[in-house]
């Protein structure tokens, strides 16, 4: 039996993690976000009602679940308050269910200004960030000049630290990026107005998780983005600024690494990517348009159209290696309904003619790669809303089996629609 279960994306994000976390937290006592920020977009559909969460863990809708934002998350006070208000307006007592690590770095207005200014300066080489200040906040953390939630306990010292760091960043904005300076007093006033709310939710997360482990409580760790966007293992520099992989759980929450019991990799039945960066199986034809339309592939956070393509088993195998995946949850299988044939990338043909079955790391090394496809029959029957494996078309079952063969990982959960009820749990991670 696994008490500590990690749910993370195996591709470039947008795999459908939010729904699965919400579903599995029926048995959990805690749900923990351990990396990223409000650049995430987790969509939940419960009894037909849609909820999009960016910063607050997906367990917040569960009455008996405590949601935790761990130290690996960069926290925007403004974004958190906006999200809290939206939920509280619907009668959800967020402040009774949400806890924060005092070590969370804060995202403030100058981080957003820097993010936007840098993307503009990059021009055609823009990374495609969400413009929410995520990267600059992580930079401040690593440079040891960042302000954290815990700094708000001493408001006078916080004000002094803020003044110093803003002088540094405003100098960059004005003199290098030719942008407007950010107003110090406004930033200070905005943060001070909600400081007590934030500090009132602070807890020692590492100790809490250790006590939960000793009691045998079920804990779910909710990843954001996807493995191939990891700052170290992704398609650098077209990556996010945090560790999206299973290793980020320990560093981003304070859980001891030996205590992770099961790692569930969310894998979409095809591939998508938002923003710039390598994408070997990207489709520019009518099939790509079909996947985009049928899958409603528009970002929950930015509204940007996602790039679409066939499933890339080579890239997913890299995710299997890095995360030591225990099992897959296959999502959006229903989007492939009606296609006469489906393809899986099983290798890459390099520019020099070599055939390889592993992914490069640096983005430059992906240039000129051609995907090697395996083609399988599609299916005309609908898989939407099917709740038993026996109800799936044989061609769909063959597709699932081939994914398992190519990756060496079992498909333990199959999602056939956006609602939490439209799911087959073949093996529950908490029972594995």
Swiss-Prot record:
SUPFAM superfamilies: P-loop containing nucleoside triphosphate hydrolases. The keyword Nucleotide-binding applies. One of its GO terms (cellular component) is cytoplasm. It is an enzyme of class 6 (ligase). GO terms for molecular function: adenylosuccinate synthase activity; GTP binding; magnesium ion binding. It comes from the Bacteria. Binds 1 Mg(2+) ion per subunit. One of its GO terms (biological process) is 'de novo' AMP biosynthetic process. It catalyses: IMP + L-aspartate + GTP = N(6)-(1,2-dicarboxyethyl)-AMP + GDP + phosphate + 2 H(+). PROSITE patterns: ADENYLOSUCCIN_SYN_1, ADENYLOSUCCIN_SYN_2. Its main location: cytoplasm. Its cofactor is Mg(2+). Pathway: Purine metabolism; AMP biosynthesis via de novo pathway; AMP from IMP: step 1/2. Substrate binds at residues 300-306. GTP binds at residues 13-19, 41-43, 306, 332-334, 415-417. Keywords: Cytoplasm, GTP-binding, Ligase, Magnesium, Metal-binding, Nucleotide-binding, Purine biosynthesis. It is found in: Cytoplasm. Mg(2+) binds at residues 14, 41. Belongs to the adenylosuccinate synthetase family. NCBIfam families: PRK01117.1, purA. Plays an important role in the de novo pathway of purine nucleotide biosynthesis. Catalyzes the first committed step in the biosynthesis of AMP from IMP. This is Adenylosuccinate synthetase. The lineage of its organism: Bacteria, Pseudomonadati, Pseudomonadota, Gammaproteobacteria, Enterobacterales. The gene is purA.
């Amino acid at each position: 039996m696994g008490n500590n279960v990690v749910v993370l994306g195996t591709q470039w994000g947008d795999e459908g993690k939010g729904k699965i976390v919400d579903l599995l937290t029926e048995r959990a006592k805690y749900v923990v976000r351990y990396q990223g920020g409000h650049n995430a977009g987790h969509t939940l559909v419960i009894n037909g009602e849609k909820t999009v969460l960016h910063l607050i863990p997906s367990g917040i809708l569960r009455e008996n679940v405590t949601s935790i934002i761990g130290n690996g998350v960069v926290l925007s006070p403004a974004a958190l308050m906006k999200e809290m208000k939206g939920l509280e307006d619907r009668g959800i007592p967020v402040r009774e269910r949400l806890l924060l690590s005092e070590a969370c770095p804060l995202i403030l207005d100058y981080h957003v200004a820097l993010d936007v200014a840098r993307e503009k300066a990059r021009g055609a080489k823009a990374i495609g960030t969400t413009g929410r200040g995520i990267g600059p906040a992580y930079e401040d953390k690593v440079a040891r000049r960042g302000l954290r939630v815990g700094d708000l306990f001493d408001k006078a010292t916080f004000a002094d630290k803020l003044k110093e760091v803003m002088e540094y960043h405003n100098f960059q904005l004005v003199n290098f990026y030719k942008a407007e300076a950010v107003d110090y007093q406004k930033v200070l006033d905005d943060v001070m107005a909600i400081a007590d709310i934030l500090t009132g939710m602070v807890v020692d997360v590492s100790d809490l998780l250790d006590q939960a482990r000793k009691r045998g409580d079920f804990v779910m760790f909710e990843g954001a983005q996807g493995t191939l966007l990891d700052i170290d293992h992704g398609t650098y520099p077209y990556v996010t600024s945090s560790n999206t992989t299973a290793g980020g759980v320990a560093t981003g929450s304070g859980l001891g690494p030996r205590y992770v019991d099961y790692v569930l990799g969310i894998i979409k039945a095809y591939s998508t990517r938002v923003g710039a960066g390598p994408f070997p199986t990207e489709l520019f034809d009518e099939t790509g348009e079909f996947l985009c339309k049928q899958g409603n592939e528009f970002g929950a956070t930015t509204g940007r159209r996602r790039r679409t393509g066939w499933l890339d088993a080579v890239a997913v195998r890299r995710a299997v290696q890095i995360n030591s995946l225990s099992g897959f949850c296959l999502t959006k299988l229903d989007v492939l309904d009606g296609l006469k044939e489906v393809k899986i990338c099983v290798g890459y043909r390099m520019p020099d003619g070599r055939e390889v079955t592993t992914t490069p790391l640096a983005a430059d090394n992906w240039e000129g790669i051609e995907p090697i496809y395996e083609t399988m029959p599609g299916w005309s029957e609908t898989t939407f809303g099917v709740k038993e494996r026996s109800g799936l078309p044989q061609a769909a079952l063959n597709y699932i089996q081939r994914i398992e063969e190519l990756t060496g990982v079992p498909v333990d959960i199959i999602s056939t629609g956006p609602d939490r009820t439209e799911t087959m749990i073949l093996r529950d991670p908490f029972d594995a």
